[in-house]
Curated annotation (Swiss-Prot):
Subunit and partners: Part of the 30S ribosomal subunit. Contacts proteins S8 and S17. May interact with IF1 in the 30S initiation complex.
Protein function: With S4 and S5 plays an important role in translational accuracy.
Organism: Vibrio vulnificus (strain YJ016)
A Pfam family hit: Ribosom_S12_S23
Gene that encodes the chain: rpsL
Top-rank taxon: Bacteria
Name by which UniProt lists this protein: Small ribosomal subunit protein uS12
Protein's GO biological process: translation
GO cellular component: a single term: small ribosomal subunit
Length: 124
């Protein structure tokens, strides 16, 4: 336990909280341009070809973003919206692309969980 005198000389340091998504700069989403669209493999024990893209954001950051859902229409120079949220089995991927916003189309033939994949309500 520190004495009063010690605390007067050197107060207790506030704990600094480190952001999991520094490139967003405290914004909910950010816009960016795809510089590379490719697939990568996850860590053990999983196995797949995960779709990801490198995105140059409007604030100058370049980040790797995951493209969720089955199939996508992204290519180089596509303008995308990115949100936070890491992909546990892809090291270094801390962002998700928002489906159905800007140049990124929603997922085709999606009936459930539509809001997460940018799909309008089907006509029925």
């Amino acid at each position: 336990m520190a004495t009063i005198n010690q605390l007067v000389r050197k107060p207790r340091a506030k704990q600094v909280v480190k952001s999991n998504v520094p490139a967003l700069e405290a914004c909910p989403q950010k816009r960016g341009v795809c510089t590379r669209v490719y697939t990568t493999t996850p860590k053990k024990p999983n196995s797949a070809l995960r779709k990801v893209c490198r995105v140059r954001l409007t604030n100058g950051f370049e980040v790797t973003s995951y493209i969720g859902g089955e199939g996508h229409n992204l290519q180089e120079h596509s303008v995308v919206l990115i949100r936070g949220g890491r992909v546990k089995d892809l090291p270094g991927v801390r962002y998700h692309t928002v489906r159905g916003a800007l140049d990124c189309a929603g997922v085709n033939n999606r009936k459930q969980g539509r809001s997460k994949y940018g799909v309008k309500r089907p006509k029925s």
